[in-house]
Regions:
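Amphipathic alpha-helical interface surfaces
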Residues: 28-35, 55, 71, 75
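Enriched for short, Lys/Arg-rich terminal
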Residues: 66-108
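Short, charged helix-to-loop "capping" segments that act as catalytic/coupling loops
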Residues: 23, 50, 82-86
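Arg/Lys-rich, positively charged N-terminal/basic patches that mediate binding to nucleic acids
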Residues: 1-37
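An acidic, glycine-rich, mixed-charge low-complexity segment common to nucleic-acid enzymes
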Residues: 1-5, 54, 108
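Short, solvent-exposed polar/charged micro-motifs at secondary-structure junctions
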Residues: 14, 57-60, 108
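A short, surface-exposed loop/turn module that caps and links secondary-structure elements
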Residues: 42-67
Length: 108
């Protein structure tokens, strides 16, 4: 799969990861990128054991088109496919990293 990094993601990455010298979290994000690049589509990724290790999830209800991955107890990486919503996992071959969310998970 192809990963596209948005400006919001790069800003959050520098602000929340780089400036605070979170080496463990930086390594985890690099591992997530390698795993996503290793698969051809989301169906293969969701069938692999990495789905449970890194907690890949699809949001529910009105945020159905958003996927999240746990970085640590506080931070989650938010991703969105670059195709229109009524899709199945085989069609998803490009993901955009939207941002790093730290608002709804407490202080870790």
């Amino acid at each position: 799969m192809i990963i596209i990094k948005s400006k919001g993601y790069l800003k959050d990455y520098n602000k929340l990861i780089k400036r605070k010298h979170l080496v463990k979290e930086e390594n985890r994000i690099n591992d997530i990128e390698k795993i996503i690049n290793a698969f051809n589509n989301m169906q293969e990724l969701f069938a692999s054991p990495y789905k449970n290790i890194y907690n890949f999830e699809q949001k529910k209800e009105n945020l159905k088109e958003i996927f999240t991955v746990r970085i640590n107890h506080k931070l989650r990486l938010v991703m969105k496919p670059l195709i229109e919503y009524p899709y199945n996992y085989i069609e998803i071959e490009e993901l955009e990293f939207i941002n790093i969310d730290d608002k709804h998970y407490g202080e870790g």
